[in-house]
Amino acid sequence: MKPLEKFLKKQTSQLAGRAVTGGPGGGPGCCGGPGGGGGPGGGGGPAGGLRPLQRRQSVSRLLLPAFLREPPTEPGLEPPVEEEGGEPLGVSEEPGSGGPCWLQLEEVPGPGPIGSGVPLRSPSSYSSDELSPGEPLASPPWAPLGAPERPEHLLNRVLERLAGGTTRDSSASDILLDDIVLTHSLFLPTEKFLQELHQYFVQSRNVEGPEGLGRKQACLALLLHFLDTYQGLLQEEEGAGHIIKELYLLIMKDESLYQDLREDTLRLHQLVETVELKIPEESQPPSKQVKPLFRHFRRIDSCLQTRVAFRGSDEIFCRVYMPDHSYVTIRSRLSASVQDILGSVTEKLQYSEEPAEREDALILVAVASSGEKVLLQPTEDCVFTTLGINSHLFACTRDSYEALVPLPEEVQVSPGDTEIHRVEPEDVANHLTAFHWELFRCVHELEFVDYVFHGERGRRETANLELLLQRCSEVTHWVATEVLLCEAPGKRVQLLKKFIKIAAICKQNQDLLSFYAVVMGLDNAAVSRLRLTWEKLPGKFKNLFRKFEGLTDPCRNHKSYREVISKMKPPLIPFVPLILKDLTFLHEGSKTLVDGLVNIEKLHSVAEKVRTIRKYRSRPLCLDMEASPHHLQTKAYVRQFQVIDNQNHLFELSYKLEANSQ
């Protein structure tokens, strides 16, 4: 299990615990005060044997407890069931056919209550937020495609529908286009998808008159929308780039045949020029600047730079440690496999003789600060962004695997105040929001789909999303670390007040990711058990923190959070793990293919969730940040936190501060 997934499991389990046990200052209701207590657990010790890395498990198994995996059973909403005979809900027998027929998706003129006779979609095809109490169920705005289709035929059906103008309005056509572009990879690989599009256009050239023109317009519209959506991703898919270029040349040759498409073909020309397609191997690639990841060398000039999106071909620097804690620094592609990384290590170590034998003798291990060790398989790739906050890569032989120990803690108790005591809450909150907005903007909307649906499609890197999840974990541990490293009781109380103020300003900035992370950090069991410290907190701050806990309460499918975010207007930063949970609910609540036929409802629901993410980023973020003398210093501090992520160590610090607190 990856460290970021452990974080999701740990934090959501902790939130669930508040529904049963309240901490100091807790009031009646689902949630108490600053979280429930807990014994020194978590963190885990060294593994007993070589354990292969389990990459990217299903999020529904990670976001525990059960209410994060199962649909809510609110009054009037029934959980997904199977009809008699074992047929999945949403599939019925077509009269006279003897086979299944997909549930017809008729246009619903307006929201109607359950039981009113209005056709409703299967609950299993909705994300968990769509099943929130009081929210009407609605079918897609476009009419059914007709007979059920297999993956290889669905694209032609959509193109024929667009060419025939059978959609009811232009907005329905736009949604239909967006649905198929965003979700085609769930049932058809991108390269195959483009091949089908290419073939459809070639066949359309043999059709004369308005019908042929309509087909070409449909093909061009789909290609334009595809390029708009996939900008920045196609450089990793060389095969797709070649097909696009071939189709582009065919379209440009046909431009003289129909003047009506001149504007669209001009736009296509501009898009093809701007889309970053993969450079052929025979050409000389341009020199690339090495991009910094989190916590790499802690260079001020690197952390102050505006974050840009990572792609698999980007190069980074990374340290790989030896069992004696010496290290070599390698330069590697972000998407490099474990075998490639070990090859670079052996080259650095100057293992010139018997290279094959030497490389096979080395293994790559991820070692967490808790001592947990995970053996990385040679075929694994993109391992750099899957590491935990204070995890490191070790290269060793199998004989020395058991002797591996984590590096010494990088965060030490130092005399005097740390940086957090010297900065203003507003400055910290604004810099948190600004940095997290940069990271959120770097995440391509399709990374959310790829992260959850990786089992049904070809692999594509999700490095930017993984880094954003790591950052959420980092902020949570930063809050706990700063509180537990403060030995003076009075200053600890001031820190609690400061973090509550930071959470309030982040909420005001509509940065719900930072807000959640700070609240969860204060709810860390090692912090919430400090009863004497919490008792000294002024009542005004206790009440404010109770409200914040209520907002992060997972009761009733995170109802409080969903109500708050539904009233916000962009720009805003959502709590990203909850989006992944909703997508996982969609993924596991209904099949993508039933008897080989594509579940259109599921595709539309997934696309709706992606469009929600798109809406959050539809406007630029504008923060009023004064250029104070300490502006750059605060910015650097916020972007390179030094934290303790070993829960056992956090509990040790907590018991040193208050040994008898419960």
UniProtKB/Swiss-Prot annotation:
SMART domains linked to this entry: RasGEF
Keyword Transmembrane helix attached: no
Keyword tags: Guanine-nucleotide releasing factor
GO biological process per UniProt: small GTPase-mediated signal transduction
Biased composition, class Low complexity, residue ranges: 49-65, 116-133
Domain Ras-GEF: 424-660
Single GO MF annotation: guanyl-nucleotide exchange factor activity
Domain of life: Eukaryota
Composition-biased stretches (Gly residues): 20-48
Any coiled-coil regions, as ranges: none
Region Disordered, residue ranges: 1-149
Function: Probable guanine nucleotide exchange factor (GEF).
PANTHER family from the UniProt entry: GUANINE NUCLEOTIDE EXCHANGE FACTOR, RAP GUANINE NUCLEOTIDE EXCHANGE FACTOR-LIKE 1
Name recorded for this polypeptide: Rap guanine nucleotide exchange factor-like 1
Native species: Mus musculus (Mouse)
Lineage: Eukaryota, Metazoa, Chordata, Craniata, Vertebrata
